């Protein structure tokens, strides 16, 4: 492996898939399902198979999301944080999603939309249509603040006032619903606050009725008359989805019995007629359609409705569209999906409204009272890691609402991840794909791995013989790695986030990628509110989506936690590039009031030598240091995108933690982090991919380790691994007793420094199969490059061609075996 790499260096060639040596990607063709759709043409008839599947069951850590499948189309209803990760883990194809329906402009509904759109763009999907509140268009514009131009995918918004949508599977009608509380008292998370310490919302012409205190008109056209772009928390959009009628099947055997010309061209118009329900006349006989065709499958209806609070109950109950379907016998409602808290479900008005759909309608409930494991692979790997060290790798838990579930008189099912309701071919609930988090099976699987138990026993013996020094055994600071993967959330590793617990009641969050709150829920379970209340500051290193799109949910959930525990609200200190302000402002203007949650400190103001003339900023910086008990909170620009920062936290007790963010090896980071107690450095790529690392402005494992050595860091934790290393990265020869690798939900303190490097042998045993596959892939890539290098060298040496041609005439032909030996000898000589 290393010999192959050394062969390439004197030839001046790149190893593996580096830089310009990589084959350029071919231009993306239309996706296969789009080509199939074009061939099929219009009017294929209703689909044979249609089902709804729960992606997220409405829990606090996952939100509520539904996936709808037919052989023609795929749909997604709501896209909160973590939905993309769940779809990837459970093999629900993202590439087929050309329609996303959103019930309201709330972070629990749209928090994962940015990442989802970027992924759809990468798959080559040419167009995606989003239906829901009109503010969607402004939300998409806001996303471009940090995503850049979304070239390659057309994003269209279908506001609730648009006509019905129709495709090969169904017709979808949008039903706008306005809360009766829209002029009254707002919910806590929507109530404006003012403070000189906080970002002040700008009054703009597009700020909607909530900004100027004007109440919208009370007539039925209120939604259409209010300003299209302003924040409107009183609006939700329900969706009534009617499947196309599926024609009956032609009975071939019956047709033969009746003497019809089966197998000839003459049968085609007969089939078309009877499938349309028309009788035919053949050789003087009239034959009814029912004799030759099974009954058609009616166009069933399903409804998705969100009722966030009691203020929406009366508008829902009095809505004329729902009344029509409650009385419609020709279009039976098979299923109603209720995204509603228990406070709504126990209301007698809402229960009576549910009952009016009749006894044949099923009801699916999605809310916080739906206990369901979603991230099964994360639970599995954490259970197996805990066999090695249960303190460093604690078992995951879950947050469940303590509120009792309502007793309802209608046929009701509580949501759980991957639960299906099939509409065609047969109406039924299907639980064969739901998740079973069986920890005993996970443990048994690990214990059966070759040498795993032996390596764990050897590791424990080694740790007992070499305990941590007494001065390092303090519990704090405690580092909890919440997301250790790069780019996009995946089933094993979530995107960037690290919690630094400074003390039992103070903590700092270093980056906050999508799904950070969900990771906190799974790590702390019922203690999540306490943890959120202890959060004193967040550092955002740069504005790539995998580093900051979890921030809004942290802010909203933190306010909920403070209220739940009866603690006074204070804005959260956020150290970030100033460009984050524009994103927060846009979201505040068009979705939810958020600015009162934040006291922002520009990261550039914490650079060494930076002058801060603003007295408000001076006070915020002093508050940051005082609240976190820090002597210094310093930042520096790093080598990644524009406005990317690393940071160093120096505690009053003397320890120093340095966080690189995303960067190539950076001298400014080395200088800022001199003599760090702990360096947390990104190691996105394996050794040998140095030029790819330059292209993507990241570091390899050895580069990250070298930064720590030059910094004289006491210990180095590597994280932010490419998702190609799903479970474990490839190890570098530079790994030593001062280096550890991070996993999601890994928890370390300074006293664990001697222990963490000793984890590597049992980790290698646990992931031996994965490591072997990665090594094989690397060696194959390198061997291909070696062969290409030899061919290139021969082609570039014209003076050698004539002797080679002469030898070709005199040498005896080589057997296949001798050719292999010749190549091997050549490689050996080069090495």
Swiss-Prot record:
A GO cellular component entry from the record: mitochondrial nucleoid
EC number: 3.1.26.11
Residues recorded with modification Phosphothreonine: 792
Coiled-coil spans in chain: none
Disulfide bonds: none
Catalysed reactions, as listed in the record: Endonucleolytic cleavage of RNA, removing extra 3' nucleotides from tRNA precursor, generating 3' termini of tRNAs. A 3'-hydroxy group is left at the tRNA terminus and a 5'-phosphoryl group is left at the trailer molecule
Biased amino acid composition, Basic and acidic residues: 798-822
Cofactor annotation: Zn(2+)
Stretch list, region Disordered: 15-47, 179-227, 791-831
GO molecular function per UniProt: 3'-tRNA processing endoribonuclease activity; metal ion binding
Purpose of the protein: Zinc phosphodiesterase, which displays mitochondrial tRNA 3'-processing endonuclease activity. Involved in tRNA maturation, by removing a 3'-trailer from precursor tRNA. Associates with mitochondrial DNA complexes at the nucleoids to initiate RNA processing and ribosome assembly.
Protein name as catalogued: Zinc phosphodiesterase ELAC protein 2
Provenance organism: Mus musculus (Mouse)
């Amino acid at each position: 492996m290393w010999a192959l790499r050394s062969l390439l260096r004197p030839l001046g060639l790149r190893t593996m898939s580096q830089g310009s040596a990589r084959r350029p990607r071919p231009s993306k063709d239309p996706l296969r399902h789009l080509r199939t759709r074009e061939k099929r043409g219009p009017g294929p008839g209703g689909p044979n198979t249609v089902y709804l599947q729960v992606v997220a069951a409405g829990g606090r850590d996952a939100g509520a999301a539904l996936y709808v499948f037919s052989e023609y189309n795929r749909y997604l209803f709501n896209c909160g944080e973590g939905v993309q990760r769940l779809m990837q883990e459970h093999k629900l194809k993202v590439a087929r999603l050309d329609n996303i329906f959103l019930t309201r402009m709330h972070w629990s509904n749209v928090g994962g939309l940015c990442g989802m759109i970027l992924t759809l763009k990468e798959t080559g999907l040419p167009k995606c249509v989003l239906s829901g509140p009109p503010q969607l268009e402004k939300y998409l514009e806001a996303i471009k603040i940090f995503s850049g131009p979304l070239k390659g995918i057309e994003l269209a918004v279908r506001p609730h006032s648009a006509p019905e949508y129709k495709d090969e599977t169904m017709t979808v009608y949008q039903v706008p619903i306005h809360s009766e509380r829209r002029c009254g008292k707002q919910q806590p998370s929507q109530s404006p606050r003012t403070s000189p310490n906080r970002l002040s919302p700008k009054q703009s012409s597009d700020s909607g009725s909530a900004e100027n205190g004007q109440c919208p008109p009370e007539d039925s056209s209120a939604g259409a008359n209010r300003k299209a772009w302003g924040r409107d928390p009183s609006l939700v959009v329900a969706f009534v989805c009617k499947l196309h009628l599926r024609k009956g099947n032609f009975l071939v055997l019956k047709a033969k019995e009746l003497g019809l010309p089966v197998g000839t061209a003459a049968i085609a118009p007969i089939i078309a007629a009877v499938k349309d329900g028309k009788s035919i006349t053949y050789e003087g006989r009239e034959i009814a359609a029912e004799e030759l065709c099974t009954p058609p499958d009616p166009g069933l209806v399903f409804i998705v409705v969100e009722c966030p609070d009691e203020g929406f109950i009366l508008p829902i109950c009095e809505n004329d569209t729902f009344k029509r379907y409650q009385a419609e016998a020709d279009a039976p409602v098979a299923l109603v999906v209720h995204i509603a808290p228990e406070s709504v479900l126990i209301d007698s008005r809402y229960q009576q409204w549910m009952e009016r759909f009749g006894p044949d309608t099923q009801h699916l409930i999605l809310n916080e009272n739906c206990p369901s494991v979603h991230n099964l692979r994360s639970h599995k790997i954490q259970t197996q890691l805990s066999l090695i060290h249960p303190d460093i790798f604690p078992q995951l838990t879950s947050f469940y609402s303590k509120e009792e579930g309502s007793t309802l008189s209608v046929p009701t099912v509580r949501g759980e991840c991957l639960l299906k309701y099939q509409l065609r071919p047969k109406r039924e609930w299907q639980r064969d794909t739901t998740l079973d988090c069986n920890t005993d099976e996970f443990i048994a699987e690990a214990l059966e791995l070759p040498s795993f138990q032996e390596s764990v026993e050897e590791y424990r013996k080694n740790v007992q013989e070499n305990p941590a020094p007494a001065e390092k055994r303090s519990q704090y600071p405690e580092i909890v790695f919440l997301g250790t993967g790069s780019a996009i959330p995946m089933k094993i590793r979530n995107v960037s986030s690290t919690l630094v617990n400074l003390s039992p009641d103070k903590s700092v969050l270093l980056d906050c990628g999508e799904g950070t709150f969900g990771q906190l829920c799974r790590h702390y379970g019922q203690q999540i509110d306490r943890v959120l209340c202890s959060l004193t500051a967040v550092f955002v290193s740069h504005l790539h989506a995998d580093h900051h799109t979890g921030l809004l949910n942290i802010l909203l959930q933190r306010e909920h936690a403070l209220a739940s525990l009866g603690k006074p609200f204070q804005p959260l200190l956020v150290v970030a590039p100033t460009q984050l302000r524009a994103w927060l402002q846009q979201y505040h203007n068009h979705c939810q009031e958020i600015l009162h949650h934040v006291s922002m400190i520009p990261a550039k103001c914490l650079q060494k030598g930076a002058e801060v003339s603003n007295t408000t900023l001076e006070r915020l910086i002093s508050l940051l240091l005082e609240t976190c008990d820090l002597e210094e909170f310093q930042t520096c620009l790093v080598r990644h995108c524009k406005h990317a920062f690393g940071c160093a936290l120096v505690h009053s007790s003397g320890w120093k933690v340095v966080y690189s963010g995303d960067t190539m090896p950076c001298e400014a980071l080395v200088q800022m982090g001199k003599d760090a107690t702990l360096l947390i450095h990104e190691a996105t790529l394996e050794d040998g991919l140095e030029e790819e690392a330059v292209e993507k402005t990241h570091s390899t494992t050895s580069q990250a380790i070298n930064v720590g050595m030059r910094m004289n860091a006491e210990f180095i934790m590597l994280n932010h691994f490419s998702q190609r290393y799903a479970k474990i990265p490839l190890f570098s020869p530079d790994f030593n007793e001062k280096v550890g690798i991070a996993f999601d939900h890994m928890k370390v303190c300074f006293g664990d420094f001697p222990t963490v490097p000793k984890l590597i042998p049992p980790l290698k045993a646990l992931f031996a199969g994965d490591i072997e596959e990665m090594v094989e892939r690397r060696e194959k890539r390198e061997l291909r490059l070696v062969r290409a290098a030899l061919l290139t060298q021969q082609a570039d040496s014209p003076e050698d061609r004539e002797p080679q041609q002469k030898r070709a005439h005199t040498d005896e032909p080589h057997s296949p075996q001798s050719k292999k030996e010749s190549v091997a000898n050549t490689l050996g000589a080069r090495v």
